[in-house]
């Protein structure tokens, strides 16, 4: 059963990436990035659609060449999710993807040319209502900043960010968000904390180059978890050397764990011991795969015995407490007369969860209709 998060979020300005609101209390958006060749339109479209299926809010696509810009046009026509074009050095690419309907430009104004070229890009973004993301990375700081600080520090990352922010300020452009990513958790956290005190624009969170699926997820959960718990962050990406779909799943899991944004099922499951009366691990793993399409927020507890089972079930949307041959079943914290056969637990629970999700979705639609009236 859903509980409100105690987190008080940092106040920020509002921008829109396509139809997705960012900042000013909007739901924290989960982003990912394609890792296909952008010029391989079919592969890139297929990957974006796989990200759409797991609920991604925004997808970033690298556009390093004019050929990639032409491919971007075709990609944009075939997907629904807002797209961010990641561009460095060549301002003409930014102008071209703007013409093709890009939803956001990820650029650093200071590395796309002289003042006139920067002005052209910013004027184009303003005319087409396209926001910009300033993206600073601890591994690619400007040479003079590297020489000044000797190594990446929070002050160095923020100085780099403010250098780009000042360029946009001088051009009277305020539709932007900023990131100050680093692969070191403490460096990233301290950089975001410092930046959050200096600007009002939305912040895009990430631990860059976090690592593989396991280590990268842990590192990102620690770093982003700290910042999010302090109310810092308006959008995020989990950077993994893995399938981008995993980035989205981990992102939603972090938000779900902090009760910031719930999407889909929050499984509460015991690590198991010799007291378990059915295969808890197998049941949870199978249900996670079968129920990936469920986006209705709900807590489902699956506990193998009666030690902690009843207590967890009483605070869950649906719950199972292990018993010999047939286990106890709870709905909305209330124990039901019906018991679930352990030998058919997975199929029975899947049916129960899908029925509950449909009912909750129906109630939500009724409430929305009542509000409209």
Curated annotation (Swiss-Prot):
InterPro entries: Dihydropteroate_synth-like_sf, IspG_bac, IspG_bac-typ, NO2/SO3_Rdtase_4Fe4S_sf. Its cofactor is [4Fe-4S] cluster. The keyword Protease does not apply. It catalyses: (2E)-4-hydroxy-3-methylbut-2-enyl diphosphate + oxidized [flavodoxin] + H2O + 2 H(+) = 2-C-methyl-D-erythritol 2,4-cyclic diphosphate + reduced [flavodoxin]. [4Fe-4S] cluster binds at residues 270, 273, 305, 312. Binds 1 [4Fe-4S] cluster. This is 4-hydroxy-3-methylbut-2-en-1-yl diphosphate synthase (flavodoxin). It comes from Proteus mirabilis (strain HI4320). The gene is ispG.
């Amino acid at each position: 059963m859903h509980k409100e998060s105690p987190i008080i979020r940092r106040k920020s300005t509002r921008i829109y990436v396509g139809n997705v609101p960012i900042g000013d209390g909007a739901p924290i958006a989960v982003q990912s990035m394609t890792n296909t060749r952008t010029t391989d339109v079919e592969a890139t479209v297929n990957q974006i659609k796989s990200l759409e299926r797991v609920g991604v809010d925004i997808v970033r696509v690298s556009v390093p060449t004019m050929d990639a810009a032409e491919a971007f046009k075709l990609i944009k026509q075939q997907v629904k999710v807002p797209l961010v074009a990641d561009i460095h050095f060549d301002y003409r690419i930014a102008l071209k993807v703007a013409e093709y309907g890009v939803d956001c430009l990820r650029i650093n104004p200071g590395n796309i040319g002289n003042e006139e070229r920067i002005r052209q890009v910013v004027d184009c973004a303003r005319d087409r209502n396209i926001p910009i993301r300033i993206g600073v990375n601890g591994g690619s700081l400007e040479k003079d900043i590297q020489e000044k600080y000797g190594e990446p520090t929070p002050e160095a990352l923020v100085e780099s960010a403010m250098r780009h922010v000042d360029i946009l300020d001088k051009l009277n452009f305020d539709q932007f968000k900023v990131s100050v990513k680093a692969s070191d958790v403490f460096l990233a956290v301290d950089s975001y904390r410092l930046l959050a005190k200096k600007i009002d624009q939305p912040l895009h969170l990430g631990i860059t180059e976090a690592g593989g699926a396991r280590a990268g997820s842990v590192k990102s959960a620690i770093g982003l978890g700290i910042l999010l718990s302090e109310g810092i962050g308006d959008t995020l990406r989990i950077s993994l050397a893995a399938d981008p779909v995993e980035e989205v799943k981990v992102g939603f899991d972090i938000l779900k764990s902090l009760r910031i944004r719930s999407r889909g099922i929050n499984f509460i499951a015991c690590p198991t011991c010799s007291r378990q009366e059915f295969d808890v691990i197998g049941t949870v793993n199978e249900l996670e795969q079968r129920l990936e399409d469920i986006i209705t927020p709900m807590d489902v507890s699956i506990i193998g015995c009666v030690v902690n089972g009843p207590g967890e079930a009483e605070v869950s949307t649906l719950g199972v407490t292990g018993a010999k041959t047939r286990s106890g079943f709870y709905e909305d914290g209330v124990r039901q007369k019906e018991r679930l056969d352990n030998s058919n637990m997975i199929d029975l629970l899947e049916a129960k969860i899908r029925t509950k999700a449909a009912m909750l979705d129906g109630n939500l639609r009724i409430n929305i209709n009542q509000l409209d009236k």
